[in-house]
Amino acid sequence: MPARARIWWRRCGIGAVWILFANMQQSGAALEHSYRYYAVGNPGAVTAISDQLQRSAFVLMGGGKDVDEAFRWMIRKAGVRPGTGGKFVILRATGSEGYNAYVYYSGPDRRTTLPPLDGWTGGAALGLSSVQTLVVPDRAAADDPFVNSVVTEADAVFIAGGDQANYIRYWQGTALQQTLNTLLAKKVPVGGTSAGLAILGEFNFAALQGTIKSSRALTNPFDPRITIGSDPLSPSGGLLSAPAFASTITDSHFVHRDRMGRLVTFVARLVASEDGAGCQGGILPASEGSANYARGIGVSEQAALLVQGDGTGEHFTARRVRNPWTKGHAPVYFVRPLEAPSQCMPAKPLTVQRVEIRKLADSGTVFNLSDWTGVDGYIVNVEEGMFDTSPY
């Protein structure tokens, strides 16, 4: 029989680090657990944060260089202040503890004072008592009591990049999914970058058959590589249930990888068939004159969309931030079809008229996610898989 798991404490070059080791089988051949756990700071510290948060908070980060201010914003929205303590948890399916020092310290010399240097969050100076990373690489790990106990106690959760197919395969239908949705119901701040962003919408591009380029998606909206959430689509088919992103599918690395075409295709796939228009298997209406309409959000690299509720659970606003040294505008795009696609079927190029796009390219404007207003929109059309004008 395997011996009990033990928690070992050690101090090393990056500061106080807790590492959970599962004891070896008596043969010494295998670890008892597949997950990996890393922490900096004191994860056992007692915190003094109210568990009655008033407003939901989310971060959609577009990949590439992480946006320092987005992490600071999450920490503040969690109710963390100097002296309160606070537990910031990173979730991922692959990788290691790379986020721990970045979020906790204010610089490469492990300083814990303000102001933080560029490229560092300064979480300890803001009040965090720990940053913990859990690598959850399979369904057994996602059901593990220790993994879920760490996440349950989190004051903020951030889902790293990687491959969203791993998150869907390993976490959906597990205790970890339930734990995350419980945190969302408690209004604990949750964010994600790249693949982590991809699972925050009600609908997910699951990438179960790999990724797809815009040109391929527009040419065949039913390409086998387009795997969206569950099959068939269902309002409960996504991994997470964040009310801010109802009827929404998200995408990252947006301008850099030219993903407008595939996001328009993903959104079109959500639109239900009716009177000869729409997409087979879709379950949502097109937006004009309808509630709960199909929509999409595309976030550029080195940008983050900060989303906040008003406390009612019904109204959400968003603001885009980026690092001061980021080149270019790093915009966020909000996409919705005003009409159902007139051609959306297997092996046929997509045709959809009156796709409305709104571009948020500054950090001062507030976008209203509840009624899709705040910046002016423009209209593009897709005819036989081709845009009639630049969608950017």
Describe the predicted segments one by one.
Residues 1-13:
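Bacterial N-terminal signal peptides that target proteins for export
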Residues 13-23:
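Bacterial N-terminal signal peptides
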Residues 25-29:
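Sec/Tat signal peptide C-region and signal peptidase I cleavage site
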Residues 31-84, 95, 99-100, 111, ...:
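C-terminal and late-domain segments of enzyme folds
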Residues 67-70, 96-104, 141-144, 165-176, ...:
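Extracytoplasmic/secreted cell-surface and envelope-processing proteins
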Residues 69-78, 84-149:
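ATP/NTP phosphate-donor binding region
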Residues 141-188:
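Flexible gly/pro-rich beta->alpha loop and the following alpha-helix that scaffold active-site loops
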Residues 160-161, 184-204:
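Catalytic nucleophile loop
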